[in-house]
Amino acid sequence: MGFFDHLQKGGAFSLQAQKPQIRKVVQTRPPPPSRSSSHTPVRSLSQTSPPGRVKRPRDSTSRSVSRDPDHRPSKRLSTPLRNRKRPTPEQRFSSDDDASDTDTSFELRKRARTEDSAEPDLARRIRSLKAFSEENVKPLPLVHAADITSKQKAGNFRRAFGGADRPTEILLQYPSASLKERFNLVVPRDNDDFKPIDDIVHVIDIVSENYIPESEADFFNNESTGIKRRLRRALAHSSETEFREAVASYNREIERLRRSGAIAKHLDATHRLNLPLVERILTQIYARTVSPRVESLRRYENGTDNVYGELLPRFISTIFKETRLKSGHVFVDLGSGVGNVVLQAALEIGCESWGCEMMANACDLAELQQTEFRARCRLWGIAPGKTNLVRGDFLQEQSIIDVLKRADVVLINNQAFTPQLNNEIINHFLDMKEGCQIVSLKSFVPAGHKIQSRNLYSPINLLKVKQLNYWSNSVSWTDVGGTYFIATKDSSRLKAFADSME
């Protein structure tokens, strides 16, 4: 388990319909406690992993750049430092009276979960024309779900529906003209391992919500006969026959809608990707490339710039919204680890996306994610932005120094950076263009800083900073919320101060 594994639900058949028990309790309520006593439970899971993601600008390693356009993928990857479980939030069924005291705290802790994804970008073309071409359809160089389960030790998975004499393989069609993905109908013995049946059901649900015109939605969503209902029923009955029939019906319907042009027309009218779709694609990529090798990321050095930690997709999506990142912009992640954020920017926003990482193991995994990213985007019929991942020291790599001069948004997860590294980064702000936004977990501008004659030439005088909050489940090293900063390069204040001295 690793970075995106918290997005998977627990249990072998975790997606089957549950029958919640709802109890109404009538009681005389004591006088409500004062608001100060109302509790907002904040859970902090194991603190074994250090804060922040690893980035270290020294000992620069091999300098290879991997670009999206038909080049070998060599992108930077960042994976979570520790293998921790993120339990699915428990849904409570209670009376209205009981809920009244907890609504405020619940909304505060879960606000990020209910927010929508980035604003529509009318300049972005979501659909990949190549992915919908019926000519010369060839197998994609992707890792099939069946490859994950078949390569594991035989004892790690068991048949989901029994029947030792029957084959377990099943094919799933995606919205594009690409060939189907192979899955095995098995469940993991360890609840943290890959769950192919969950993935199938999630894919069908995401496709029905994001690719299907409203006029065709009943086939998927009808509460009695819809595909999603049939899948839940098959799992509840533990019926392989019903499950295969439902998937086969889904495959036929998707192929019909694609050939009729309905899916393409729907995508062409879409100008943003919803976050659940983004999360599903990123989760698939991570599960097929990084998760099987996540142990290689366990090596880190406390007290150095090589401590590893991740910003999770919903938090990153919030950053994209706050900075108003658009498809025509340039995004740079300094210390990109296994490349998760670089890929998310290219996928969710469609912008040119860059990352730089120097930890060799993370870079190796980034290259695997890069390759899978291209194939998965094609499978889902999406045209992402160009991605460029660079190995080496982001303070010294010329390609990064050059791209920073035209960057619109720069992300620096400096939670665990040493003061020396933070100071060295500041010097690069001089070359950034006006209006460039620098997002960080620690502010580069000290609280209460004022422009004075004695610090007139400090680069931080060019920055206008605002502080924002991130909520629970936003970072990999803690469940507790915190603060982050967006610094905008704005020379007007410094110019005004200099003019006042004349």
Curated annotation (Swiss-Prot):
Residues 181-502 form the DOT1 domain. GO terms for cellular component: chromosome, telomeric region; nucleosome; nucleus. Ubiquitination of histone H2B to form H2BK123ub1 is required for efficient DOT1 methyltransferase activity on histone H3. Coiled coil: none annotated. S-adenosyl-L-methionine binds at residues 308-311, 331-340, 357, 393-394. Residues 35-46 have a biased composition (Low complexity). It catalyses: L-lysyl(79)-[histone H3] + 3 S-adenosyl-L-methionine = N(6),N(6),N(6)-trimethyl-L-lysyl(79)-[histone H3] + 3 S-adenosyl-L-homocysteine + 3 H(+). Its EC number is 2.1.1.360. It comes from the Eukaryota. Residues 1-121 are annotated as: Disordered. Keywords: Chromatin regulator, Methyltransferase, Nucleus, Repeat, S-adenosyl-L-methionine, Transcription, Transcription regulation, Transferase. Its main location: nucleus. The keyword Transcription regulation applies. It is found in: Nucleus. InterPro entries: Dot1, DOT1_dom, H3-K79_meTrfase, SAM-dependent_MTases_sf. One of its GO terms (molecular function) is histone H3K79 methyltransferase activity. Residues 57-72, 106-121 have a biased composition (Basic and acidic residues). GO terms for biological process: DNA damage checkpoint signaling; DNA repair; methylation; subtelomeric heterochromatin formation. Histone methyltransferase that specifically trimethylates histone H3 to form H3K79me3. This methylation is required for telomere silencing and for the pachytene checkpoint during the meiotic cell cycle by allowing the recruitment of RAD9 to double strand breaks. Nucleosomes are preferred as substrate compared to free histone. PANTHER family: HISTONE H3 METHYLTRANSFERASE (PTHR21451), HISTONE-LYSINE N-METHYLTRANSFERASE, H3 LYSINE-79 SPECIFIC (PTHR21451:SF0). In contrast to other lysine histone methyltransferases, it does not contain a SET domain, suggesting the existence of another mechanism for methylation of lysine residues of histones. This is Histone-lysine N-methyltransferase, H3 lysine-79 specific. The gene is dot1.
